[in-house]
């Protein structure tokens, strides 16, 4: 197996350092497999990719995690701004119905929007005839400018003053025109764009003349079609999972089980099938020696999105009851008896509650210097003696030979010590039930409709999602993206990506980096030695744009998936093969150095990320399209869209976590004490600012969201300064027609409209307790109320809601 792929490990509770523009939970509630899954990987030339992508801001080596409810990375979406012309061709050609059915209200609103847009277009075209007679006129009347002006106008709410509530001013019209689609708990620009990308992929995979010279691309189509074989999946029912449970040694809930096989079951569940009971194990770059990979162990094992759901039992009584009902229903579908199944699942739930009690909250895990502990396997054995770590890790990383002296990095020593004690005092039958429950969670999305229906009931309680109307093909595209994401990316890039976009994006990154470094030179609170080291780090940031080159080389692409077998008539078996293959790929990484050219997101992903152990920023092809970027849009919109995303990722190198890493990607102290103290004073202001914001009466956690808030604020400033530098070099742009905004104002409106969003109250609560990003509304309000440039261009007086008087600035 010719692989150079790095296993990223996952787990919603892992230390979080891979910094993404948005959380993967902004993905849809399309069922994907398993709780916290370590099947996500980085991939580079000659490497083996799967379910890629970073969980929003996770630790070095943290991935997008495939969750039963949470797909960690890309959002599923539907665009308000349309696709660039080249992508639109790929989107429309030969396709049938590309999106799911809409509600009657949505259709009425869509019709009204089209009518208004047509009237606007007619007026603007008429104006265009007149204005084009005067070439000196400062209004842009190209077709692209007219279309984007219409999009902006229909998203605005002119009844609100921009100095009162800039989010409502920018997004009020969009919110009115975008009721939540059926089956979704949230809807935003990212979701919309991902839906469009999915429709492109559907067309490519269902093409009856599909004839690729790449075996990996052929595997991608076979995998996708096996997922679409609903009749075959229904015919098999629960039997594939029943057989698997029997093979492992049985499950007390459904029948006889081997009472003396804790280690064997743990090895099968966590090793062969890559579930994460109790803890997660993954291979990633050593934070203190980033040129080498090392075994890493972290806390894991909770099924619900956050420990809060287990511990605040009064507030979350409905969720816990729905979860227990879900557990019971799945146990019954697999052969459990009514009375005993609920009783035993209650015991499993109580065990998860005990795990939640010892799980360290996200906001207490932001300083990796404090939670990073490197030790040998023998020292790990002494710390957590409830299991044989050498036996377990040797099985997990077979055929590698390990010894007691093998180094391991542990994040959360107290957690592992306490989980070992918990295992020792828990009855063997409960341990077995919990382990098999982790396997059940991971695999049931590959089974028949009854399991999907059970999940939908839990989703409704947890996220406020009504009965799902997500078409099967969308679920299958997501699964294919998880399994063969870079082979799928090869198809996507060849069909849609404009190569010139890569060159233009590289130029924008350079401009934004220059603007950031110029601002760095003006900071009065930073000493010269630290400033010079920070400038060197900014200069050293490595950028990757669009896609990795190897995906367009058939032989190299085939090599990375060599050994992954695809059955044409068993989707369940294809998923099992994926878990097994990913385990082998993970083992292959330990003795190899990390590659700087590895990718952690597939090209079709609508997201971006910064990875501190490589000091790199990555922008997949999926996000390099409208509304973030379009070649024929005003520069104000491009800098306000993809420019702010670029600035955001670059600023992550200097947020409260990224700043701990040097230019080589190593975790070490490189700041002078006085500058570090000043940095903490500035971030304390921002933490307190965001602590004051509320959603439905519930406060934001300014500590949990600090890194993303720093990146949002720094990214906006860098992008705007880069735009001003562009204007100094090229001169003022023509203005858009009819919108009544200067181009400087347009920059800020373009930034805000990227974050237009709607979501259910339940989903909003889930975001507050799990997401390292602030809610969309406060990503706009919090950032702009700290921007002197915004306040000046919109004339917001001190004391107005958008200008409270005190500005919190870090970078």
Swiss-Prot record:
A GO CC term assigned to this protein in UniProt: plasma membrane
Cofactor comment text: Binds 1 zinc ion per subunit.
PROSITE patterns assigned: NEPRILYSIN, ZINC_PROTEASE
Catalytic activity: Hydrolysis of the 21-Trp-|-Val-22 bond in big endothelin to form endothelin 1
UniProt topological domain (Cytoplasmic) ranges: 1-106
Cofactor needs: Zn(2+)
Pfam families: Peptidase_M13, Peptidase_M13_N
SUPFAM superfamilies: Metalloproteases ('zincins'), catalytic domain
One GO biological process term: G protein-coupled receptor signaling pathway
Family named by the database record: Belongs to the peptidase M13 family.
Function: Converts big endothelin-1 to endothelin-1. Also involved in the processing of various neuroendocrine peptides, including neurotensin, angiotensin I, substance P, proenkephalin-derived peptides, and prodynorphin-derived peptides. May play a role in amyloid-beta processing.
The name this protein goes by in its record: Endothelin-converting enzyme 2
């Amino acid at each position: 197996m010719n692989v150079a792929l790095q296993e990223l490990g996952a787990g919603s509770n892992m230390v979080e350092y891979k910094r993404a523009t948005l959380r993967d939970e902004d993905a849809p509630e399309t069922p994907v497999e398993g709780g916290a899954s370590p099947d996500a990987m980085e991939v580079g030339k000659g490497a083996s990719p799967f379910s890629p992508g970073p969980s929003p801001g996770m630790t070095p080596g943290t991935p997008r995690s495939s969750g039963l409810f949470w797909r960690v990375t890309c959002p599923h979406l539907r665009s308000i701004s349309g696709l660039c012309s080249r992508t639109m061709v790929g989107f429309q050609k030969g396709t049938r119905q590309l999106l799911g059915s809409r509600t009657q209200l949505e259709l009425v609103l869509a019709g009204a929007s089209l009518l208004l847009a047509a009237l606007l277009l007619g007026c603007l075209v008429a104006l265009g005839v007149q204005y084009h007679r005067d070439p000196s006129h400062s209004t842009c009347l190209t077709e692209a400018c007219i279309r984007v002006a219409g999009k902006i106008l229909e998203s605005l709410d002119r009844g609100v003053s921009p100095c009162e509530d800039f989010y409502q001013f920018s997004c009020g019209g969009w919110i009115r025109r975008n009721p939540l689609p059926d089956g979704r708990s949230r809807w935003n620009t990212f979701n919309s764009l991902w839906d469009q990308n999915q429709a492109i992929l559907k067309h490519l995979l269902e093409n009856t003349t599909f004839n690729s010279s790449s075996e990996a691309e052929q595997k991608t189509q076979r995998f996708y079609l096996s997922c679409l074989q609903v009749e075959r999946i229904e015919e098999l029912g629960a039997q594939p999972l029943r057989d698997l449970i029997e093979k492992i040694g049985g499950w007390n809930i459904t029948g006889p089980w081997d009472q003396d096989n804790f280690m064997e079951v743990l090895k099968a569940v966590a090793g062969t099938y890559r579930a994460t009971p109790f803890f997660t194990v993954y291979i990633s770059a050593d934070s203190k020696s980033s040129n080498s990979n090392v075994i890493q162990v972290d806390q894991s094992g909770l099924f619900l999105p956050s420990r809060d759901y287990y511990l605040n039992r009064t507030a979350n009584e409905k969720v816990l009851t729905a979860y227990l009902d879900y557990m019971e229903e799945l146990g019954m579908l697999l052969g459990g008896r009514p009375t005993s199944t609920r009783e035993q699942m209650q015991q499993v739930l109580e065990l998860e509650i005990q795990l939640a009690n010892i799980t360290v909250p996200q906001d207490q895990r932001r300083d990796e210097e404090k939670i990073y502990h490197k030790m040998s396997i023998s020292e790990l054995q002494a710390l957590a003696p409830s299991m044989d770590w050498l036996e377990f890790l040797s099985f997990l990383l077979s055929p590698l030979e390990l010894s007691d002296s093998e180094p391991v990095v542990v994040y959360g020593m107290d957690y592992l010590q306490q989980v070992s004690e918990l295992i020792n005092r828990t009855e063997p039958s409960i341990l077995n039930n919990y382990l098999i429950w982790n396997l059940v969670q991971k695999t049931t999305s590959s089974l028949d409709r009854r399991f999907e229906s059970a999940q939908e009931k839990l989703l409704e309680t947890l996220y406020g999602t009504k009965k799902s109307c997500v078409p099967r093909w969308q679920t299958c595209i997501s699964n294919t993206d998880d399994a063969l994401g870079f082979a799928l990316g090869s198809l996507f890039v060849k069909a849609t990506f404009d190569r010139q976009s890569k060159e233009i994006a590289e130029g924008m990154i350079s401009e934004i980096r220059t603007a950031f470094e110029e601002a760095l030179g003006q900071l009065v609170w930073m000493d010269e030695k630290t400033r010079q080291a920070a400038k060197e780090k900014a200069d050293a940031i490595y950028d990757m744009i669009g896609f990795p080159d190897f995906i367009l080389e058939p032989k190299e692409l085939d090599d990375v998936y060599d050994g992954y077998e695809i059955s044409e008539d068993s989707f369940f078996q294809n998923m099992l093969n994926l878990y097994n293959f990913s385990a082998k790929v993970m083992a292959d990484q330990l003795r190899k150095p990390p590659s700087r050219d590895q990718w952690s997101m597939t090209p079709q992903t609508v997201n971006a990320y910064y990875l501190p152990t490589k000091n790199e920023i990555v922008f997949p092809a999926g996000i390099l399209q409208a509304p973030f970027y379009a070649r024929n849009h005003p520069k104000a919109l491009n800098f306000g869209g993809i420019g702010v995303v670029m600035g955001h990722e670059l600023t992550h190198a200097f947020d409260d976590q990224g700043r701990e890493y040097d230019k080589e990607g190593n975790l070490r102290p490189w700041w002078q004490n006085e500058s570090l103290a000043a940095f903490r004073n500035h971030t304390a202001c921002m933490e307190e600012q965001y602590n004051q914001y509320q959603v439905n009466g519930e406060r934001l956690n300014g500590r949990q969201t600090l890194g993303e808030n720093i990146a949002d604020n720094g990214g906006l400033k860098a992008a705007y300064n880069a735009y001003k530098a562009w204007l100094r070099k090229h001169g003022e742009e023509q203005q858009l027609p009819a919108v009544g905004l200067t181009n400087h104002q347009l920059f800020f409106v373009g930034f805000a409209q990227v974050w237009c969003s709607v979501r259910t109250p339940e989903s909003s609560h889930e975001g507050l307790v799990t997401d390292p990003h602030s809610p969309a509304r406060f990503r706009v309000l919090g950032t702009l109320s700290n921007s002197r440039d915004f306040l000046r261009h919109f004339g917001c007086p001190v004391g107005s809601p958008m200008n409270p008087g005190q500005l919190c600035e870090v970078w």
